[in-house]
Amino acid sequence: MWVLEEGLTSLSNVSRIGVLQPNDGDILEQIIDKGAKIIKDAPDSLPFIKKYADVRVVRRFLKGVISGEFEDFIILVFYNKEKALSGASLVSRGRPWYAPEGVTFLNEECSVAFQKGLGLSRAMAYVLEKRAGIDVKLLAFSNANTLNNKMLENTFEKHLGYSSYKTFYKEI
């Protein structure tokens, strides 16, 4: 694992954030096993995610991410102060179709937290802002868990200065 940030911040109880590397398959398997259970079993996960999420497809894709097959994605991992794996996030990097060359966005595609109240979103926002690089013009975060709406709104809008834009969806 390549360590991005180490040490507690005033924003959260995350003590280490890293990027999974090709030799981190054992950590990836823990994330997949715990994450699949959370996403599939949590009563407040969005219905279409519960319905269509396929662990085999997810495993194959995430293995491709850490092997470098999908260069526009990284997997961030989060550890608490006891050094226990506490969550993970799939982050994409790319240029939106409407932006000129040289404009890059970072987007949280999916996150799973194995420990409530850790401040994973705040820690991720902090480290991505700090390490984004000169070409990154926008950070975007998502939420697929309706239970966390108010908490994430509080985190991103009130504490971190983000704006929100609702996404509408309909299963057809």
Which residue ranges define each predicted feature?
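A short beta-loop-alpha structural element at the N-terminal edge
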Residues: 4-38
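Conserved GNAT-fold acetyl-CoA-binding loop/helix
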Residues: 40-63
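A short helix-loop-beta-strand connector motif used in the catalytic cores of GNAT acetyltransferases and
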Residues: 60-77
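Conserved beta-strand in the GNAT
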Residues: 77, 84-94
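A conserved beta-turn-beta hairpin within the catalytic core of GNAT-like acetyltransferases
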Residues: 95-108
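A short, internal acetyl-CoA/4′-phosphopantetheine-binding micro-motif in the GNAT/acyltransferase core
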Residues: 106-120
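Conserved acetyl-CoA-binding loop-helix of GNAT-fold acetyltransferases
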Residues: 117-130
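Conserved beta-strand-loop-alpha-helix junction that forms the acyl-donor binding cleft
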Residues: 139-153
